Each structure stands twice: as structure tokens, then as C-alpha cells.
Design a protein with these regions (language model features):
Chain B
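Conserved thiamine diphosphate
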Residues: 131-135, 189-224, 260-282
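Short, conserved beta-strand edge motifs with alternating hydrophobic and charged residues
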Residues: 168-171, 208-211, 218, 237-241
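Cofactor-binding active-site loop characterized by glycine-rich and histidine/acidic residues
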Residues: 23-26, 33-163, 184-197, 202-204
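Glycine-rich, charged/polar anion/phosphate-binding loops
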Residues: 153-156, 220-227
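N-terminal glycine-rich anion-binding loops that anchor highly charged ligand groups
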Residues: 13-29
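Short gly/pro/ser/thr-enriched loop/turn and capping motifs at secondary-structure boundaries
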Residues: 69, 174-178, 198, 244-246
């Protein structure tokens, strides 16, 4: 497929358009989705009408629940949550109803809704506008958790998510929105559960998600010629491509996990546990986690940077793992 | 629209079916054949029966953790319902749902719900789907006066009005005189007003309060609201005052005249010829007995089934 350069935000917009054209059951709602300032949903109302593209009041419980209901009733809602932190007011609908209904109904019910969520720190927005929280959602049974890191994956993963018959939480780091990349014009799927080998290497495996994939690549570039770094982007946390992670750890014997989510009880620990359970004998050094410590993110930019994973921290971790 | 004789008989039959089924559930729970106790609907039968008398298959309901009346009135198969309550493989949800999460999409019974007020936002979604389909189907969202305070319920009243959804909110207020919570007296009130329906005005929809043990009144009020929703004129909040009656009424109520006046079956029975009443009761007892036999004979799920249905395979 011939590709051209567009942004992450434009790629998401194209995915919406492609699926809404293909399937009349795809509907979109959320706060301000009809406005031109919401890049992912820009122009959808004009193109598909106000029945299928609706602004919702700032009541996350009501409109996420309505999405769950519409999905149960046969639609494929794509519901936008302005920031993941705001989803915390709607946890019953997300974690009890959205995630569990398929199982509780013994498979009688499908909930093919995609909950699109903006995430991420680095904008000096403080502790309730900066979180990642993918580990929280991945912890609960029943949700597929999608964490795109580039425009190509954003489009393909969103299309695959909308077509998947299960509950998905699709987590978009807002600093990725202006990032450009090569994206085919045609619709395509990036399958859920297949990791991306972003960079091949032989000395150290780095597992990174979302915005941290680019940070990991920057670190690998800096170490070029000294340490050969393999970078893997799982792309989805649920389902997790365990084979890709374990295979790489077996090859390199050294593991660094980079995660913008909180350190404790999270994705970084999950990957280290996976390596311990399935590749212990291959490990030549203790795995290292570069993640945000369990501290609410502060407003001050210097303080915020202090807590977040960075290229420098990743470089140091890779060096330590390789030593 | 007032009740004609045929409708009266239909509604009465539904109420008897619910009462008979729940009395059996009481007994089976005591005997340990249903593994857990849960909230029953005794005393409230006129609400589900009177509302459902206006509903058709394409209409959808969202219910509560006191769901049996709503499910039965919407037309759920009694065999599969009883098997589900017994946790059997042949239940609607293969023993994974139990009383709090029963789903029967074949009749639009889209869920009992274990969270107070939890089904209400979802039911707005059923209404949204109906609105988009354009078939003039509606949704009915059941909750109690306790649930009415939940943020999600308040939010959904607003959303339904903003989107002019074809939905009827049915609040069954089971504390019509003294405010109670989970059947117990409370020191501080949980409602700041006497009638939940007063809140309707603030959300831009009609609201009214009715005697929930009078099937004719329920039928009339529900008919008006459901016709309004079908016509695309938006949501309504109905409140029905009810008394939850504990225990097997056949024995206990005779000693309690005060409670007896709140029994919707006793009230409607006056309009049913004795022979018809006897026939309905006999038929419903037989149906419930068949459901019990079906449930008892059904196999348990296998341990492997604990692992299935977390996710669905792609179509």
C-alpha cells in the first residue's frame, strides 16, 4: 500500500472515517466530539451526521454506560474520554459493566465498544490530567488494552479495535498527536496481540509502550556502536504478545522495561514476572524497570520531568543491564 | 388507556407467575438448592406486569438486583431462569450470572445488575440504539429510590433528556411511608424530597408518582409514558410507590390486614372471576414446577467452563 506522511491524530481521524463508512453501526460520542478542536473526530459530524456523531454532557458515567448499552444492543460505539483521569469517575461502568458483561452473561452478550482515551504526562497538567493508568485497566479481566506508539499503528490498531467484538480501551498519549509517520491511505488492520519489533539488537531487550517507545529508540541511538539494543513495542497489553517478549529476553539475556505508568503493581512488573517465569535461566543480569514512581505527578515542569522516564534514565538502565 | 378484561387477565397472570416463581425460589433457597439469598419482588408485581403489558419484543429493559419480576414480565423463559438461579449449565448464562446478572437478549431483557443504579446508563444506550434503528422501540430502566440518588442515574436522566431518548425511567420506591434502606430503618433520610418524580422537572422531562400496588394505575401511567417515548417525544420519569412484602404471603398475610391492602395480587384479584383465577394459578404452578424440575435435572457447568467467555472470538 502506498503511504504518505500524516500525524498520529490524522491517522486516528482516518480510522474513524474508514470504519464509519464501512459499517453504519459505528457511532461516535463523547465530550466535544463535534468540535473541530478534537483532532481524532474532526469533521465526522459533517460527514456522518449528528445522529451518529454526538456531543455528550460532561457526565462520563452516563455516556460511557450509554456506549456499553448501545454496544450490547448491536452498535459499535467509539466513545471518547477526554483524559484517562476523568474515567476514574466512571469506574463502575468501565470495570463492572463494560469489562465483565460478556463473561457474566455466559457469552450471551457482546460489548463491541471502543473506549478511546487520551493519556499521558509531560504537559505540566498536574496529578489529575497526566496519568497513564493502562496497568489499572489491564489488571481487570475483560478489557483489551491498546497502546499505539506511532501513526501507522494508531490507524491500524483503531480499525482492528473497532472490528473486534470485545471491550477495548484504546489509550492515546496526547504528546503523540503531532508525531508524523508514513501511513497508507487505505484502511488496514494491525492485529491486537502482536508486538512490533521496532529495532533489532543482541545485547539488551527494551520493552516500551506508547510515548516511551520513542524515548527507548532515542536511548538506543545514543548507545549505538557500544550496546546493541533490541526495542519491542507490545502495542497491546491485553492480549500481550508474550512470545515476542520471552523470545527476545532469551536471545539477549538482559531486560529493561520502560513504562510511563506507575512503577508499583503495573505493566513493568508484569513483564519482569513474565521473564522470571519463562526465561529465568536466560537472564544474565537482574531486569531493570524505568517507570514513574508512585507519586502523584506535580505541576511544576522540573518536578514532573524528575519523576518521568527519560532518555537519560533509559540509557543508564541499559548500561547497567549490560554491565 | 384503561384496562380491559383481557389485559387485566394477562397482567394478573404475569403477577401470579412472578409470585409463584418467587415463592418457589424462597423454598429452594431454604432447601439449599439455590445457593445464595437475594432480593425478591414480592409486593411489586403490579409494576413489572403493568409496564410490560405495553412492551413488545424489540423493546429493551435494564433491571436491578431485584430482577426476577422484571425478567419474567418481559417474557423470560422460566426453565432457563430457574436453571440460572441454581447455577446450572442450562441457565441463560450457564451459571455465570445468577440472580444479579441474568441476561436474556432473546426477549430484550438486558440485564439484572449487581450495582445499585448500574444498569441505568446502559439502558440509555439501549434507548439510543432503538432511536438510531428508527423502529419506534423503547427502553425501560428500572431502579429503586435508593438507586435514584446514584450519580449515574442523575447523569442519565440529563443525558436522556439532552438526546431525547425513547426511554421510560421506572423508579420503584419501596419506602412509601418511612424511609428505609435495604429494608432497615435509617436515622438520616436518603431522599431529600418525598417523591423521586419531583426531580424529573429539573431534568426537563415529565414525572409523576403513582400507587404501585394498583395494576390498573400502573398500566395507565406506563402506557402514557411509553406511548410518548415511542412517538419520539422523549423520556419520562415514573415513580411507583410499593411495599416489599416479606415471606410467603399465602400463609403470613392473612394475619396482617395492613400488609394485605398493599398486596397487588389481592387488589387485582377482585376483578378476576374465581374460576379464571383458579385456572391461572393451577397453570402457573405447573409451569413453575416444570422449571424447577428442569433446573434440578440440569447438569452443573464443568470446571473448564470457568475459563470461557472472558472474551469473544472475532465474528
Amino acid at each position: 500500500m502506498p503511504a504518505r506522511e500524516i500525524t498520529f491524530g490524522q491517522a486516528l481521524n482516518e480510522a474513524h472515517i474508514a470504519e464509519m463508512e464501512r459499517d453504519p453501526k459505528v457511532i461516535v460520542f463523547g465530550e466535544n466530539v463535534s468540535s473541530q478542536w478534537r483532532e481524532a473526530t474532526k469533521g465526522l459530524k459533517e460527514r456522518f451526521g449528528r445522529e451518529r456523531v454526538r456531543d455528550a454532557p460532561i457526565t462520563e458515567t452516563a455516556f460511557i454506560g450509554a456506549g456499553v448499552g448501545a454496544a450490547i444492543a448491536g452498535y459499535r460505539p467509539v466513545v471518547e474520554l477526554m483524559l484517562v483521569d476523568f474515567g476514574l469517575v466512571a469506574m463502575d461502568q468501565i470495570l463492572n459493566q463494560f469489562a465483565k458483561t460478556t463473561y457474566m452473561s455466559g457469552g450471551a452478550i457482546s460489548v463491541p465498544m471502543t473506549l478511546r482515551v487520551l493519556t499521558g504526562a509531560g504537559t505540566s497538567s498536574g496529578a489529575t490530567h497526566s496519568e497513564s493508568l493502562h496497568g489499572l485497566f489491564a489488571h481487570m479481566p475483560g478489557l483489551k488494552v491498546v497502546v499505539p506508539s506511532n501513526p501507522y499503528d494508531a490507524k491500524g490498531l483503531l480499525i482492528a479495535s473497532i472490528r473486534d467484538p470485545n471491550p477495548k480501551i484504546f489509550m492515546e498519549h496526547r504528546l503523540l498527536y503531532p508525531v508524523k509517520g508514513q501511513v497508507p491511505k487505505e484502511p488496514y488492520e494491525v492485529p491486537l496481540g502482536v508486538a512490533n519489533l521496532v529495532r533489532e539488537g543482541k545485547d539488551v531487550t527494551v520493552i516500551a509502550t506508547s510515548l516511551m517507545v520513542q524515548e527507548a529508540m532515542n536511548a538506543a541511538d545514543e548507545l549505538k556502536g557500544k550496546i546493541s539494543v533490541e526495542v519491542i513495542d507490545p502495542r497491546t497489553l491485553v492480549p500481550l504478545d508474550e512470545e515476542a517478549i520471552v523470545g527476545s529476553v532469551k536471545k539477549t539475556g538482559r531486560l529493561v522495561v520502560v513504562d510511563e505508568d506507575y512503577l508499583h503493581y503495573g505493566f513493568s512488573g508484569e513483564v519482569v514476572a513474565l521473564a522470571a517465569e519463562k526465561a529465568l535461566k536466560s537472564l544474565e543480569a537482574p531486569p531493570i524497570r524505568v517507570a514513574t514512581p508512585n507519586i502523584p505527578l506535580p505541576f511544576n515542569a522540573k518536578l514532573e520531568r524528575e519523576l518521568l522516564p527519560s532518555k537519560e534514565k533509559i540509557v543508564a538502565a541499559i548500561k547497567q543491564a549490560a554491565s | 388507556m384503561s384496562l380491559n378484561d383481557a389485559k387485566t387477565t394477562d397482567i394478573y397472570r404475569t403477577m401470579i407467575r412472578i409470585r409463584t416463581f418467587e415463592n418457589a425460589v424462597r423454598r429452594l433457597t431454604k432447601e439449599g438448592r439455590i445457593p445464595a439469598r437475594f432480593g425478591l419482588y414480592t409486593g411489586q408485581e403490579a409494576v413489572a406486569a403493568g409496564v410490560s403489558a405495553h412492551l413488545r419484543k424489540g423493546d429493551k429493559i435494564g433491571s436491578t438486583h431485584r430482577a426476577l419480576g422484571h425478567l419474567i414480565a418481559k417474557g423470560c423463559d422460566l426453565d432457563k431462569l430457574m436453571a440460572e438461579l441454581m447455577g446450572k449449565e442450562t441457565g441463560f448464562n450457564h451459571g455465570k450470572a445468577g440472580p444479579y446478572h441474568t441476561f436474556d437478549p432473546s426477549v430484550g431483557a438486558l440485564g439484572a445488575n449487581g450495582i445499585v443504579g448500574g444498569s441505568v446508563p446502559m439502558t440509555a444506550g439501549y434507548a439510543l440504539a432503538n432511536q438510531l434503528e428508527g423502529e419506534r422501540n423503547v427502553a425501560v430502566s428500572y431502579f429503586g429510590e435508593g438507586g435514584s440518588n446514584q450519580g449515574g442515574v442523575q447523569e442519565t436522566l440529563n443525558l436522556a433528556a439532552c438526546w431525547q431518548l425513547p426511554i421510560v425511567f421506572v423508579c420503584e420506591n419501596s419506602s412509601p411511608e418511612v424511609q428505609r434502606m435495604l429494608g432497615h430503618e435509617i436515622d438520616y433520610p436518603q431522599l431529600s424530597i418525598d417523591n423521586v418524580s419531583k426531580r424529573a422537572k429539573n431534568y426537563g422531562m415529565p414525572g409523576s408518582t403513582h400507587t404501585g400496588w394498583d395494576a390498573a394505575e400502573v398500566y395507565k401511567a406506563a402506557g402514557k409514558a411509553i406511548r410518548r417515548a415511542r412517538a419520539g417525544k422523549g423520556p419520562t420519569l415514573l415513580e411507583f410507590k410499593v411495599h416489599q412484602l416479606e415471606g410467603n404471603l399465602e400463609g403470613r398475610l392473612e394475619a396482617n390486614e395492613k400488609e394485605r391492602q398493599w398486596d397487588p395480587i389481592d387488589l387485582l384479584k377482585q376483578k378476576i372471576p374465581r374460576k379464571v383465577d383458579e385456572q391461572i394459578r393451577a397453570e402457573e404452578v405447573a409451569k413453575v414446577q416444570k422449571a424447577i424440575d428442569f433446573g434440578v435435572k440440569s447438569p452443573e457447568p464443568t470446571p473448564e467452563q470457568a475459563y470461557t467467555c472472558v472474551f469473544k472470538e472475532a465474528d
